[in-house]
């Protein structure tokens, strides 16, 4: 069985990708949720290298978590008004999805925002596997 976290750690170490750019198209939805729920705390679950927050336009500064990036690999404690996870779920092995969903829901007190890719990734892991290890149609995720 593939150790995906080890694969992603190696990929992050040797690659400038997974900078967090996939957040940009979603930012207006996230801002709307923050405003609607009057949220003041936010967790970016699977933040990659966290570069997406360099020019943060949101009214909150998020806590960053990504088990494959040494700088952000420590699991956060406590709860957050909102949890966002963009382009992450498809990188998690199918058998671990229920556990990750449960963990995310336990962190969130007001909202969860997920953006999940349903197509193969352009990226290939160091072991040659596609970076999207759980490819399912939208209906499967809902």
Feature locations, PLM:
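A short His-aromatic
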Residues: 91-92
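Conserved N-terminal segment of class I S-adenosyl-L-methionine
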Residues: 1-82, 98-102, 107, 118, ...
């Amino acid at each position: 069985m593939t150790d995906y976290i080890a694969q992603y750690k190696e990929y992050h170490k040797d690659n400038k990708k997974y900078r967090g750019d996939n957040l940009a198209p979603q930012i207006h939805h996230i801002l709307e949720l923050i405003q609607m729920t009057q949220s003041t705390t936010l967790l970016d679950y699977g933040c990659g290298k966290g570069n997406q927050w360099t020019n943060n336009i949101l009214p909150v500064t998020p806590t960053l978590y990504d088990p494959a990036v040494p700088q952000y690999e420590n699991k956060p404690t406590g709860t957050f008004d909102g949890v966002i996870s963009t382009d992450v779920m498809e990188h998690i092995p199918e058998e671990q999805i229920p556990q990750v969903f449960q963990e995310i829901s336990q962190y969130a007190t007001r909202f969860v925002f997920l953006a999940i890719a349903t197509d193969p990734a352009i990226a290939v892991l160091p072991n040659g596997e596609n970076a999207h290890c759980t490819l399912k149609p939208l209906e499967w995720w809902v």
